[in-house]
A protein has these predicted regions:
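Sec-dependent bacterial lipoprotein signal peptides
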Residues: 1-19
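Long, charged/polar, soluble alpha-helical segments
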Residues: 19-109
Length: 109
């Protein structure tokens, strides 16, 4: 009975230890796909702020995962994905010629 309990605890511990690397890898892959979609839409030229932010965040995410700080890696990868989506959407709007696309309006006081 003790051996079974120990085996179950060891399996559970192993599964919990693997959650960080698996989750961070999934978030990194998603962000990389979003960045590639933004590149395809021409975001590097049509939406440079969001494009640059996405690339800097994915770089930082990879760095944090390299240091085994998976929580920070997931956070930065999520930000990279968010900025890549914004870059793609903005680039597509500019390419379509939507009025106001790419125009930044200051926040109201």
């Amino acid at each position: 009975m003790n051996a079974l309990r120990l085996a179950v605890l060891a399996a559970l511990w192993g599964a919990l230890c693997a959650c960080g690397p698996i989750k961070s890898t999934a978030f990194l892959l998603d962000a990389e796909v979003q960045i590639e979609a933004a590149r395809t839409a021409g975001a590097d030229k049509l939406s440079p702020y969001e494009w640059t932010a996405a690339n800097l965040y994915i770089h930082k995410a990879r760095e944090e995962v390299g240091y085994s700080d998976f929580e920070a890696g997931v956070e930065y990868a999520g930000k990279a994905s968010k900025f890549a989506n914004e870059a793609r959407d903005k680039a597509m709007a500019v390419a379509r010629g939507d009025p106001g696309a790419g125009v930044v309006t200051p926040p109201s006081p």
